[in-house]
C-alpha cells in the first residue's frame, strides 16, 4: 500500500505544487510519516491554517508542500485553506482514490472507479486501461474501454462483441462473468441495445448471438430482422476475420438447425443466395440446385460459371472447392460438346481434329471425374455425374468411335499421312536412348 501511495503522490506532485491529504479514518499516519520525496515539504494542519497559508504563499511560494490533516476534511465554511485547496488537488488515500491517482483521473470520474472496484483490483487490467485511455474520454467512453479490457478486446463495442462471440463458441463465459463482477453488465446491455437494437426483458448473450445470426441472414436477403443494419456490419466483419473463423463455424453450425435454415432454403431460389454464406447449408443448397439445373440443361454455361466464380468469396468455398471445380469442368465439357463437330472425312482429319480440339473433351471429362472423387461429397454430384457420363459415353466416345470405325474400315494399310505410327515413333524418338542405355 505504501508504495502505491508514494507513487500516487509523486504523480500528483508532477502537476501540482500543493497536495492536500485528509486522513478521515485516522489510519494513515504511518504512511504520511514514511513518505519522502525530493523537493516536497510535509506540513500538518493543526489549528495553524493562517500560518501555513502565509508560509506557502509568501515565504516559500516555489516550494512544494504535502498538507496533511489527521482527521476528516472540514466543512467549507470552516475550511480556512479552502481557496488553496480548490486551486490544487486533494489526495484521498482509500483504494479507489489511489486508482484514480494512478490513472490521472479528475474528480468527476470518481464514480467510474468506485462503482466498478472489482475491475481495478487486478493491476494487469488497470495497466491495460491506461494504454487505451484518451484525454478526451467521457465517463461512458471510459466504461466502454473497461468492457474492452474485460473481454480482451482492443477497440470499441464491436470488438467486445467479437471477443464474446469467440468465447461463446468455445463454451466459456469468463469475460461475461468478469463484466458482471465489475458492475458493467447493465451498461453493456444498454450499449448493445442502443448500437444494435437488441431488446429483451432478460438480456442474455447467447440469445443476442442467435438474434445476430438471424438478423444477418434476413438482412442479407433484403428482409427485416430483429436487429438493425449496424448489427449486420458487425456480423460481416466478424465472419470475414480469419482470427474468428473457427468461432463463426462453430456458432453457425449450432444455430443452423435452431433457426430452421434448411427448411427455409427449400422455399428460396438459389439465385437469391449466391452472395450469402452465413450457414454451410446455403452452399449445399446452391450446389444441389445448380446440379439439378445442369442435369436438366435449364441453365446456360455462362450463368453457371458466374455463380461458381461468385461462390469463391464464400466462407465455405475451401471445403467445397473440389465440388465447385467439378461443376465448372462439367459446364465447360457440356459447352464444348454443344460446339463440337465430331464428324471426319478421312482418318487424317479425325486425328488432326482430336489433337487440336477433341482432346479437350477428354481432358474436361477427366478433370470433372478427378474433382468429383476428390471432393468427398460424391452424392451431391450424383445427378450431374449421370448426365456427364451419359453424354461423354454416348455423344462423344461412341460418336467418335463410330466415325473412326467407318474411316479405318476401308484402309488397306494402317498408315495416316502426316502422322507417325507407334513403331516409327519408337524408332525415331526412343530407340536411340535405349542403345545408349539411357533413361528417358
Report the location of each language-model feature.
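…; additionally, a secondary subgroup of soluble metalloenzymes is captured
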Residues: 1-437
Amino acid at each position: 500500500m505504501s508504495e502505491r501511495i508514494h507513487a500516487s503522490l509523486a504523480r500528483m506532485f508532477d502537476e501540482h505544487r500543493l497536495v492536500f491529504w485528509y486522513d478521515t479514518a485516522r489510519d494513515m499516519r504511518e504512511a504520511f510519516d514514511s513518505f519522502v520525496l525530493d523537493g516536497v515539504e510535509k506540513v500538518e494542519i493543526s489549528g495553524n491554517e493562517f500560518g501555513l497559508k502565509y508560509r506557502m504563499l509568501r515565504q516559500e511560494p516555489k516550494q512544494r508542500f504535502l498538507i496533511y490533516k489527521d482527521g476528516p476534511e472540514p466543512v467549507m465554511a470552516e475550511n480556512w485553506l479552502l481557496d488553496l485547496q480548490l486551486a490544487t488537488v486533494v489526495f484521498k488515500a482509500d483504494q479507489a482514490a489511489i486508482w484514480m491517482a494512478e490513472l490521472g483521473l479528475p474528480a468527476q470520474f470518481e464514480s467510474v472507479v468506485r462503482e466498478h472496484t472489482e475491475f481495478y483490483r487486478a493491476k494487469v487490467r488497470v495497466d491495460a486501461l491506461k494504454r487505451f485511455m484518451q484525454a478526451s474520454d467521457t465517463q461512458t467512453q471510459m466504461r466502454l474501454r473497461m468492457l474492452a479490457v474485460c473481454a480482451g478486446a482492443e477497440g470499441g463495442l464491436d470488438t467486445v462483441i467479437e471477443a464474446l462471440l469467440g468465447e461463446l463458441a468455445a463454451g466459456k463465459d469468463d469475460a461475461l462473468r468478469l463484466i458482471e463482477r465489475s458492475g458493467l453488465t447493465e451498461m453493456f446491455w444498454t450499449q448493445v441495445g442502443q448500437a444494435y437494437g437488441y431488446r429483451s426483458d432478460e438480456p442474455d448473450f447467447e440469445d443476442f448471438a442467435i438474434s445476430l445470426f438471424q438478423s444477418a441472414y434476413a438482412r442479407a436477403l433484403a428482409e427485416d430482422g430483429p436487429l438493425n443494419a449496424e448489427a449486420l456490419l458487425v456480423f460481416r466483419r466478424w465472419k470475414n476475420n480469419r482470427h474468428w473463423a473457427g468461432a463463426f463455424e462453430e456458432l453457425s453450425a449450432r444455430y443452423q438447425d435452431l433457426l430452421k435454415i434448411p427448411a427455409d432454403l427449400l422455399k428460396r431460389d438459389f439465385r437469391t443466395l449466391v452472395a450469402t454464406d452465413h450457414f454451410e447449408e446455403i452452399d449445399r443448397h446452391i450446389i444441389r440446385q445448380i446440379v439439378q439445373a445442369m442435369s436438366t440443361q435449364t441453365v446456360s454455361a455462362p450463368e453457371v460459371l458466374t455463380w461458381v466464380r461468385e461462390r469463391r468469396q464464400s466462407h465455405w468455398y475451401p471445403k467445397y472447392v473440389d465440388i465447385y471445380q467439378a461443376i465448372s469442368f462439367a459446364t465447360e465439357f457440356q459447352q464444348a460438346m454443344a460446339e463440337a463437330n465430331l464428324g471426319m472425312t478421312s482418318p487424317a482429319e479425325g486425328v488432326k481434329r482430336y489433337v487440336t480440339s477433341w482432346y479437350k473433351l477428354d481432358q474436361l471429362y477427366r478433370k470433372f471425374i478427378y474433382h468429383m472423387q476428390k471432393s468427398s461429397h460424391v452424392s451431391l454430384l450424383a445427378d450431374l455425374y449421370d448426365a456427364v457420363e451419359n453424354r461423354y459415353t454416348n455423344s462423344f466416345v461412341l460418336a467418335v468411335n463410330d466415325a473412326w470405325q467407318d474411316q479405318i474400315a476401308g484402309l488397306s494399310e494402317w498408315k495416316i499421312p502426316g502422322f507417325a505410327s507407334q513403331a516409327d515413333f519408337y524408332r525415331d524418338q526412343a530407340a536411340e536412348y535405349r542403345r545408349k542405355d539411357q533413361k528417358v
